[in-house]
Structures are given as C-alpha cells and as structure tokens.
C-alpha cells in the first residue's frame, strides 16, 4: 500500500475548478474554472506554491481545460464560449496571441502533440479538430473529425507518435492518425467496452497502453497489438495495430470517474471521482502483459464535492494535483510503502 498526503490547498478560484496543467519542465501549474480565469501558480523555491498571475481576458464563459505546449512557452485554454485561446509567455508576461474559432459549442478539452506542431480540440458539437501550428501565432485547421455521435469529452495525443485518442458521451474511444499518402486524418479503431460516457483517457509512458474512465464507474486498460505480435492477436489489414481491453477495474468507485492520469515516471494510475475521492492504482508485479491486474494502493476523500481533475507532475515523481467543484486546487504527494 501507499500513503497520499495533502501538501497544500490552493485557493483563489470562484466556483468550480475544472482543469489543471503542469508545465513540462518548470515548477509551474495552470488551473482554470467556472470563474472564466486561468491562474498560474509556482513553487517559490521552498516547496510552497504561490499565485503568480491571473489571466482573465481570454474567454467569456467557463474555461474547461488548459494544456502547456511541449516547449513550455505556450498555454492553450478551452472554453464553453466555443473558442480556444493560445497564450504566449515569451516575454515573461502572458499574452493571448491567437483565438481558434470553429467549434459550434462548448470546447471540452485541448491537447498538444509531442512535437508541438499539432493541437487537438473537442467539443459538445460532437467534433474533434486538429490544428497545425503554422507559425507561433498562426494555427490552421488540418482536419475536422465527426466520428463520434455525441459530445466529445477528452482528446489526448499519444506520447511518442502522431496518434490521437478521443473519448465521448457515446460510450466509445476513437483513435486517429493521418494517412501520409493523402494527408487525411481518420479513425483507425473504435474502442467500445464502456457502458456509459467515457470521461477521460490517458496513455502510459510507452503509448502501448491506454487507460479510460467512465460514468459506468469503471476504469479500463487497453493494449495495443501490432501486426505479428507474440500473442497472436490478428490485425485485419496486416498493417494497422488493433487495441483490445485487457483489464477492467470495477468495484472501486461508487460514482462516475471523471478523470484519469497515468504517471510517466512511476507507472501509477490516479483517478478523480464523483464521490469526491482520489484513488491510486498500481500494476501487480509479474502480472501478464496481455492480462494485467491492478491493485488500489491508496485512496483519499480529497474534496467536499466532485473531484474533476487529477494529474501527475511530469517532473516530480509522486506529486499530483486535483481540482473540484468545491473551488479548491490541491497538491498531493504519494509515497509507496514498498
């Protein structure tokens, strides 16, 4: 088992806090919420996190998600006002240098590809958009993907390839890639196992596994099987990998599971749930790759209302952030007993 310890509660947002994003290198955190603001927090050098900046002029409605570019210079924010704002902190101060328009309804999620050359967004309008970063302040729409039949909740890029995953109210996950012959983006696999809305998804460090969480109160682990794999899983065209559900975590959550994060440093999975709890799971050592088992190693009543977001720090092992309907942002430290 392990121990989850509260390090600090960051107060400042008014109303629900929807999203949080760690800077890829620096001890900096961005959060966003119902109050239409983005708040930037930083470690003051002593381990205490302090407010640095409030960005309040980019959106006219709730801000649902924030994501830093891989280089750490740009911050993208997705809003219920149907736009995505791109913030540039080159000069040290944040400036909104682009507003991406095109979605017809609330934008729910935003994600940068590993190279930073592509940005994905998704919306209540059932679409996923892929944007090419032409220049630092120019973004061109490369694809509009209308594969889902309902509200799209989350987009997440593969950590090593230009492969995109999206999760939807239609209970499915779609996987997309570009056909290099004609530059068209399309779905190459539909992952359908959940019984209700898929709220969030997260790749592991290798990108060969994907975790998903749902309104059906479960977490599912999906495994990629490439052509000629040792397990004998057939790939229909002999070229395209297929993804299979290899593990279902059920009985741990008592409400909808709203977010999931797979730590790239430790392999631990964290979930944020509608029962106000945060839970940590670890793969059981020695469990087979195509039939893995996971155990819950920590749980904490983290908030007084729904836990909306959980995200592991990309730079500090065991550090994670949670956000909630209760208006708080909390920083936690997980320590393993083993």
Curated annotation (Swiss-Prot):
A cellular component term, taken from the record's GO annotations: cytosolic [4Fe-4S] assembly targeting complex
Organism superkingdom: Eukaryota
WD repeat ranges, renumbered to this chain: 12-51, 58-97, 102-141, 147-186, 193-232, 234-252, 253-291, 302-338
Pfam families named in the record: WD40
Cross-referenced InterPro entries: CIAO1/Cia1, G-protein_beta_WD-40_rep, WD40/YVTN_repeat-like_dom_sf, WD40_repeat_CS, WD40_repeat_dom_sf, WD40_rpt
Keywords, ordered alphabetically: Repeat, WD repeat
SMART domains xrefs: WD40
Any one GO biological process: protein maturation
Similarity section: Belongs to the WD repeat CIA1 family.
Free-text function comment from the UniProt entry: Essential component of the cytosolic iron-sulfur (Fe/S) protein assembly machinery. Required for the maturation of extramitochondrial Fe/S proteins.
Protein name: Probable cytosolic iron-sulfur protein assembly protein Ciao1
Organism: Culex quinquefasciatus
């Amino acid at each position: 088992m392990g121990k989850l310890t509260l390090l600090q509660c960051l107060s400042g947002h008014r109303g629900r806090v929807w999203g949080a994003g760690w800077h890829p290198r620096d001890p900096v955190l961005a959060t966003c919420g119902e109050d239409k603001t983005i708040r930037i927090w930083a470690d003051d050098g002593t381990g205490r996190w302090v407010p640095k900046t409030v960005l309040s002029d980019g959106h006219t409605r709730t801000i649902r998600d924030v994501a830093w570019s891989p280089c750490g210079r740009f911050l993208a924010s997705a809003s219920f006002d149907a736009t995505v704002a791109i913030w540039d902190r080159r000069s040290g101060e944040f400036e909104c240098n682009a507003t991406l328009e095109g979605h017809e309804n609330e934008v729910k999620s935003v994600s940068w590809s590993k190279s930073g050359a592509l940005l994905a967004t998704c919306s209540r309008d059932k679409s996923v958009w892929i944007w090419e970063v032409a220049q630092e302040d120019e973004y061109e729409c490369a694809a509009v993907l209308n594969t889902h039949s309902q509200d799209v909740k989350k987009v997440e890029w593969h950590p090593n390839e230009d492969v995109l995953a999206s999760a939807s109210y239609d209970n499915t996950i779609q996987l997309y890639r570009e056909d290099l012959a004609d530059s068209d983006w399309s779905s190459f696999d539909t992952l359908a196992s959940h019984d209700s809305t898929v709220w969030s998804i997260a790749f592991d460090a290798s990108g060969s596994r994907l975790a998903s969480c749902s309104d059906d109160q479960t977490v599912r682990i999906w495994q990629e099987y490439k052509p000629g794999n040792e397990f004998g899983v057939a790939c229909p065209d002999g070229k395209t990998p297929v993804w299979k559900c290899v593990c279902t975590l059920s009985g741990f959550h008592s409400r909808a599971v709203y977010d999931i994060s797979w730590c790239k440093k430790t392999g631990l999975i964290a979930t944020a749930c509608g029962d106000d709890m945060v839970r940590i799971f670890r793969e059981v050592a020695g469990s087979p790759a195509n039939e893995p088992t996971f155990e819950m190693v920590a749980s904490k009543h983290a908030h007084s209302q729904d836990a909306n977001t959980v995200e592991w720090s990309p730079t500090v092992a065991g550090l994670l952030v949670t956000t909630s309907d209760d208006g708080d942002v909390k920083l936690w430290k997980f320590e393993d007993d083993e």
